[in-house]
Amino acid sequence: KTQVFLTPKGDHYRTRLSHTLEVSQNARTIAKALRLNEDLVEAIALGHDIGHTPFGHAGEFVLNGLCENGFRHNEQSVRIVEKLEKDGKGLNLTWEVRDGILNHQSRLMPHTLEGKIVRFSDKIAYINHDIDDAIRALVLTEDDIPLELRKTLGFSTKQRLNTLIHNIIMNSREKDDIMMSPEIEEA
């Protein structure tokens, strides 16, 4: 996953695996609080980035130029789980899992609430940990983050994570949708 830091030193920078596990953990937390299908969000979360290329976004950029219809990791993720795994037989995943994987990052929204949870959880994870990785790499400090943003989302990685997850839970309770408040989503 390390998109910004190509040669990280130490063991605190995120990888594709740690990102996927963070997405899964955040998604399960939200699903549990909303009494939705935790196993479904976990299956979607664990498969959502399986189609990413080596070398991060640079690899995806190169493949995008080589492929006739472009390259999108979410579409490749679905190809992997439907066709490439198990010697070409696929993993026999439900439509809901495949829909969540495909639409976690596209112009279309997932058709299930669980898929929408993973879509938000993915954004929460990559935004929060890109900031955290930049702070650990001394590229920026917490004080470099605009004060208004820190007041809204929190003054640390943990506070931002809690704010974002709590906001989704509170704004999605007893609704037929998964959403953030406009103030938090805009931040």
Predicted regions and their residues:
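Histidine-centered, transition-metal-coordinating active-site segments
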Residues: 1-16, 20, 24-30, 35-38, ...
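A short acidic, glycine/proline-enriched capping/turn motif at secondary-structure boundaries
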Residues: 28-30, 49-52
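Post-HEXXH active-site segment of zinc metalloproteases
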Residues: 39, 43, 56-71, 136-138
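Short alpha-helix carrying the canonical HExxH Zn2+-binding catalytic motif
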Residues: 42-47, 120
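Acidic, glycine-rich active-site loops and adjacent beta-strand->loop/helix elements
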Residues: 46-50, 105
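Short active-site segment of divalent metal-dependent hydrolases/proteases
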Residues: 51-55, 125
